[in-house]
Amino acid sequence: AQGGERVLITVGVHGNEQCGLVAVNQLAAEGFFEQLWAEDSKLSELTLMIGNPGAVKANARFVDVNLNRIFVDEAKVRSGGDSYEESLTPALAEAIDQSTWYLDLHSTSAPTPCFCIPASASSIAVSESLPVQYVLEELLCSLEGTTLHWASRDAGRVAVCVECGQHLEPESV
């Protein structure tokens, strides 16, 4: 892709958190993503990625280990590992590294208002423009091992985790 923003949206990093997958499928069915390619668009690439397909298929948080806690050691992330989730980290890390904007969609097991967590100070303005009830800026530096923490290594990247509300509640999608 030439110039423009390279956007990555991940869903299903935790397999039992499927509201993001449902929402992305609904948006695709409604033609939303085609609208992003207007002539004046600053978007050059959009990647939609299921973070943990095996866990999504099993409707389980994870298969072997929590994928959203193992993005710590760069060498291990880049080479993968023995567990199912560790085998996913090289491709997911590469996709994050290639993006200029990263949106990671999650949901919660308990009733929760929609909120987001920006990965860096440069992501706060974007977070505040999203249709969420609040932004948790206090968690900027406390999420080690997550895909959001991995994304924050590039201070210029806009990266936000959105917790959409309770799993599969209609208002969460």
Question: Language-model features: where?
Answer:
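Structured catalytic-domain cores with a bias toward divalent-metal coordination
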Residues: A1-V173
